[in-house]
Amino acid sequence: MSRLEQRFAELKAEGRSALVTFVTAGDPGYDASLQILKGLPAAGADVIELGMPFTDPMADGVAIQLATLRALEAGQTLVKTLQMVREFRVDNQTTPIVLMGYYNPIHRFGVDTFVTQAKEAGVDGLIIVDLPPEHDAELATPAQAAGIDFIRLTTPTTDDARLPRVLERSSGFVYYVSVAGVTGAGSATTEHVTEAIARLRRHTDLPISVGFGIRTPEQAANIARLADGVVVGSALVDKIAQAKSADQAVTDVLSLCSALAEGVRGARR
């Protein structure tokens, strides 16, 4: 059983949803980013999505675009992102880490080298936003062969004809993007999310995590009553942007994570 399967199974047995947190690797700098990464589990993160900075993050809103820029300006590379995961794994062998980003940097790095090093570093899953199922052979197939889950995005515009193709080779969990558009956009209504999850459950037994537009503990709790996972990214990244120092960034991100975790954990009581 993979770390992702294990974590979602444990939480299902506990009767609660997972808090899935997104931060960009290397934002606001390597050391502070590593502190955040290492601090997230104790602050209540059940699964961590770690963004791989790329110069053209087309699916991301302003907050994550700026985070990517900060990380790149601080010298973050794919090699350093994998090193961060290695350093995280020294102290934590249980919290799943999913790398999220775009195909171009992986292609340039070399797919086989990337998959080998990602597995060795302790990466559990990949979300590659610009690689559709038609291109499975390029990365999804070798990644899954190495034991790395390949997580697909589904959106309100993924219709019933397309959905089986998207979900066919998915593993780990399904990431439902509740609002069409870029990350950090407005949030969806509870009714919309309820309907969307019911539709997805007709097509897959995988855990369903819902993200995009969730910013507060109250919003997180609302989604946690419906979904297997609640994804929060832009709200955490905004804390880094607003911080006056790297130390403040670490403190503020982990404080918000704790508040979100309280919302998620109390949602079904």
Curated annotation (Swiss-Prot):
Pathway recorded for this protein: Amino-acid biosynthesis; L-tryptophan biosynthesis; L-tryptophan from chorismate: step 5/5
Active site residues according to the UniProt entry: E49 (proton acceptor), D60 (proton acceptor)
Keywords of this entry: Amino-acid biosynthesis, Aromatic amino acid biosynthesis, Lyase, Tryptophan biosynthesis
Transmembrane segments: none
Record GO terms (molecular function): tryptophan synthase activity
Gene Ontology, cellular component aspect: cytosol
Top-rank taxon: Bacteria
Pfam families the record matches: Trp_syntA (PF00290)
UniProt KW Transmembrane keyword: no
Enzyme Commission number(s) from the entry: 4.2.1.20
Enzyme class: lyase
InterPro entries in the record: Aldolase_TIM, RibuloseP-bd_barrel, Trp_synthase_alpha_AS, Trp_synthase_suA
Family, per entry: Belongs to the TrpA family.
Subunit: Tetramer of two alpha and two beta chains.
NCBIfam families tied to this protein: trpA (TIGR00262)
Function: The alpha subunit is responsible for the aldol cleavage of indoleglycerol phosphate to indole and glyceraldehyde 3-phosphate.
Protein's name according to its UniProt entry: Tryptophan synthase alpha chain
Lineage summary: Bacteria, Pseudomonadati, Pseudomonadota, Gammaproteobacteria, Pseudomonadales
